[in-house]
Amino acid sequence: MTGIGICSPGPLDPRAGVVLNPPNLPCWRNFPLAAEIERVYGVRALVDNDANAAGLAEAIWGAGVGYHNVFFAILGTGIGTGIVFDRKIYHGRTGSAAEGGHMTIDYRGPRCGCGKLGCIEALASGPNIARRAQAKLAAGDASRIRELAGSVEAVRTEHIGQAFHEGDSIAREVLAETAMLLTVWLGNIVDVLEPDVMVFGGGVAELMSSFFESMRAGLEQWSINQRAGEIPLVLARYGNEAGIAGAAALCR
């Protein structure tokens, strides 16, 4: 074994191998992850943001093959993003670039785990999609979602997805709202980066893939870029193995 690749939630410093202050892992603040792995295993360790690494794998071997500029997003428990230009991760000056999940799209919105208000993660990640569905059910709306979950408190995105495929109107409403939130967010991404392709991984991405075409059409309204509606929105090749592929890509 010549090296170990590690995908970690960010923000982090990939050059130093230090995890800085991930909102969902507060116990890892300023944690020297690469140094600890090297101390234990005696080989070089490379650490990067999980979305950066997965995006690199998709650009090299997956759904981003053939494109120069790849925007990658993991839509799941949180929302993580990565930017890959010509098979190279864009890290920014300190390594903390591409934290697109914490881009605010509603300054009066719910508070995110990062402390800001109205981040796209606070609105369209899996747990927050479920919370919006729970609010509708708590208001008394009848839905198959409640039957599948057993109670309002137990609602998860898998229940919403199943109800959607069974034709439930509340599930469709919740997911259509999510699609609109994501479209507004992606319009900003396009205006800043103008990617050649946008690749999505994670359980929420699979759930939302039925809306990709309408989201792409919506980009014509939410971006000033004249070719926004031409940019493909595609599912990642590696799915739940994106982290493994990303770790391998770091060591290539």
Task: Identify the function of each model-found stretch.
Residues 50, 76, 247:
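Active-site glycine-centered loops adjacent to acidic/histidine catalytic or metal-binding residues
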Residues 71-73:
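Conserved beta-strand elements of the Class I
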Residues 1-3, 12-18, 34-43, 57-67, ...:
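ATP-binding/phosphotransfer module of carbohydrate and carboxylate kinases, centering on a glycine-rich
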Residues 96-99:
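Structural signature of FAD isoalloxazine-binding scaffolds in flavoprotein oxidoreductases
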Residues 48, 56:
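Generic enzyme active-site microenvironment
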Residues 18-28:
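A charged helix-plus-loop insertion that forms the helical arch/lid used to bind
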